[in-house]
Amino acid sequence: AASAGGGARSADDIIAKHCNACHGAGVLGAPKIGDTAAWKERADHQGGLDGILAKAISGINAMPPKGTCADCSDDELREAIQKMSGL
């Protein structure tokens, strides 16, 4: 899913490099990749996908801002969240 500029990373690349360490195993309460019910519960409490994205950008609990992907765009983070969550 490259942007018009061709520089965007794929959601899979971002997940593998920045998200999988915690979301792959559910470390420290992180919702696991593919556990749509866990992600939906969070979405319901945080204002949907936009709410989850906002928390991902600012950081939440043990998760640092942008989940260690400081140079990820909001769109890249949204795509990674959608891919991990199934939402």
UniProtKB/Swiss-Prot annotation:
It comes from the Bacteria. Disulfide bonds join C69-C72. Heme binds at C19, C22, H23, M63. Gene3D superfamilies: Cytochrome c-like domain (1.10.760.10). Homodimer. This is Cytochrome c5. GO terms for molecular function: electron transfer activity; heme binding; iron ion binding. The keyword Iron applies. The keyword Iron applies. Belongs to the cytochrome c family. Binds 1 heme group per subunit. Keywords: Disulfide bond, Electron transport, Heme, Iron, Metal-binding, Transport. InterPro entries: Cyt_c-like_dom (IPR009056), Cyt_c-like_dom_sf (IPR036909), Cyt_CIE (IPR002323). SUPFAM superfamilies: Cytochrome c. It is unreactive with cytochrome c reductase or oxidase but seems to function as an intermediate in nitrate respiration of facultative anaerobic pseudmonads. It holds the Pfam family Cytochrome_CBB3.
